[in-house]
Amino acid sequence: MLVLPLAPLAQHPTVAVCPQAAAAAVDSGWRAYRSGALEPAAAQFAAAQALCPSAAGPAVGTGFVLLRQGRAGEAERLFQRALAADSTAADGWYGLGMARGRLGQRREAVRALRRTVALARDYVDAVDQLLAWGADSGLAPPPAPRSPEPQVPARTQGERFEVRTARGWEPFYVQGVNLGAALPGKFPSQFPTDDSTYARWLELIAAANANTVRLYTILPPAFYRALSRWNEGHAEHALWLVQGVWAELPPRGNYDAPGWKGDFGREMRRAVDVVHGRALVAARAGHAWGRYDADVSDHVLAWVLGREWEPFSIHAYNRRPRGRRSYQGRFLAVARGTPADVWLAEQCDELLQNEWDVYHTQRPIAYTNWPPLDPLRHATESSRVEEQALRRRSGFPPNPRLKEYDNDVDALDAMLVRPTAANLAGYFAAYHAYPYYPDFIDLDSGYGAARSAEGPSHYFGYLLDLRRHHAGRPVLVAEYGVPSSRGESHLQPEGMHHGGHDEEEMAAIDVRLTREIREAGLAGGIVFAWLDEWFKHTWVTIDLELPAERTRLWHNLMDAEQNYGLLGEYAGAAGGTPEPGGDPVRWRALPVLEHSDAVALRVGADPSYLYLVLDGGPALDSTRYVVGIDPHPGGGGERALPGVPRVSDERFEFALVLNDTSDAQLLVASAYNPYLVPRSGAGPTALDAFYHWGATVERASTRGAWDSLFVTTNRWRIGRDERTYAARGVNRGRLRYGRAAASSLADWYVDPDAGLIEVRLAWGLLNVTDPSSRRVLRRIVPPDRFETTVSPGFRFAVAAVARDHDAVRAWLPAGTTFAWASWEEPVCHERLKPVYAALRDLWGSW
């Protein structure tokens, strides 16, 4: 959108002396222009030009009218004419730059906009456009307001944080929320750019009695403006910021690669300038950009650098030749450590030096760590090499798919980093710590013996171990929580699994984790996360979310990583989505696909679910229902549906079996099952390969070979202690009965008053790899190729089978294909999950 100064001619008077009537006509032209009345605007500018032919102002106005009409070439000529009359007309240079930009003359356009800024430093539209084009504005930032006294808004004191207030230094326990900002349909770097979104989020976060927001990376200027406004208006409920500096992994584990390291250094300096409101950041792929003019530095609690560094990358760096083992910096030092310890200390020190030298400011700093790289030793864990050797020695076959990164091989130890005497703010340890991963948290008998006020807790035992190691230094749990996903990716002894929780269960577990972090004596916790983010992947589902770049367009309830939000993001319009046990009108609004005198099948789809409703038909108390589902008509599948005493003319890859309210599940044709399932007589390591290599949608069968939707969540392991730990998994196809109002994971419900059997199936259960383009799994080809194909639509057959004598009481053959519309922008709505209120009440009680 083109935004012009309120009074261009008043800002940049033309050289020509024109009659008052010409100036009045120009003013009228701009008023008409801003109201969208282009023809009257053009007429007024033309009248002014006739009264004063040599003036630049009327030509500039007409040029902008032409630009808005899409006539960039004519506009360019008018702007050139205006500048010939007055070369100091900043509006003329701005218009010329915009016209040339639309004509594809980017270099000349940038030159014109830089001329604009040189003439009028505060011409923000020109600055913003230059930054949007990824160009340097040419402006040097104003001198930094460097206080003569050191500015230390926060510091570490023993094992806690303190913040400076009007009353002096006060203890500060972190009650935080991690703010990811990728809305449905957006890539992770496509942040909201409007102030109102961030203002609304910050108000909600503060209302939950949180006191801290953490960012992983630099967000757009709108976030910092919203944070500044919130804190200025709510001094007693101010939000502190933990600012991150993101980094991708370096190539081949070389953290000293000049290009990569230089980019990271520039990003650190950029982050410092951003929080002080003194940055002009040009657009770059994958990054926020813009004019950063909001100074929030007085409420930045700490820096946390980097990401969850992958063990394989740290391992590679530690084994590079001539790695440094010590570091003596101005604010941080390492007497003896690994090259990775030294490198991270150096980066932290460089950021501290930059903020001190430019702004005379210090605050606490840490790098991101997580359990796979903790400095503790875990006997139940083994490296890849160790495990394969232990398998051979114990008579077990090697694992052909042992891709798990070498947890507990290398370590990052914050206790090796020592603040120097010049460090006024301190240093701390920051961990992403969840209760369900890695396995050593849940297999260690010592952790299993731990007991918090909540009860037995491996997680609490692990937190106590972390605190013991970091005695005297704050430990911040910078990520924790469980998701409200239907799918489960890892099981945990106390039931705090990686997924498989409805929203009420999620709330109870997150409250428990929050309490245990405090009881363990840590410096605070930052819950993950503010928002459900659809673009994410977890290891169980990632290979079946294809194309990967389209995951953002649909909501996979089987993917735990997409469902951590306190603010839920849900498919469909608010108030219009069918829910088990909900308004029957919504279910009856779905179109009828097949029908008979006895029963009708209605079908619908949205970015989360396939909806099926049986309308009419025999009651479930006397009848079993089996629905055959064919996601790729013309392919393979089974003709014999389970428990149905007739063979279909069509083939099906899935069978929905509704026996009664306590026994319902989705089955998959064995040939099309992407995962290995337990088989009778198989050995303990039979599930090592994880995937069913050779699964295909094209293999036909009449054997009635159906599998459960079992998936291995915890693989078979052998530890350094030579103890073995059995594989574990879940049957994802078991359907949960009930009302969605009572359980967010309800899959189906019988509404006897309405005569409806209501079912919703998450797309991930049906081997749909991208519902937004109707793409389904075609086959899995060894060693690691997952092929997909576009489905023409789904077909369904319905059998109603009498309970007493197995006779088919009603039959709907597969006929019509259900081809739902594809989409490029998902329809969705949001609401706060119960965990929001649960944490609000807990945090408010402390």
Go through the PLM ranges and name each one.
Residues 272-301, 307-496:
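Noncatalytic carbohydrate-binding groove/subsite architecture in carbohydrate-active enzymes
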Residues 34-35, 68-69, 102, 132-137:
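Register position in tetratricopeptide repeats
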Residues 490-495, 505, 516-523, 527-591, ...:
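Aromatic-rich peripheral "rim/lid" segments of glycoside hydrolase catalytic domains that contact
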Residues 592-717, 773-803:
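Surface-exposed, glycine/proline- and aromatic-rich loop segments on solvent-exposed faces
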Residues 146-232:
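Active-site-adjacent substrate/metal-binding segments within catalytic domains
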Residues 194-266, 348, 352-358, 452-453:
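Aromatic-lined substrate-binding rim segments of carbohydrate-active enzymes
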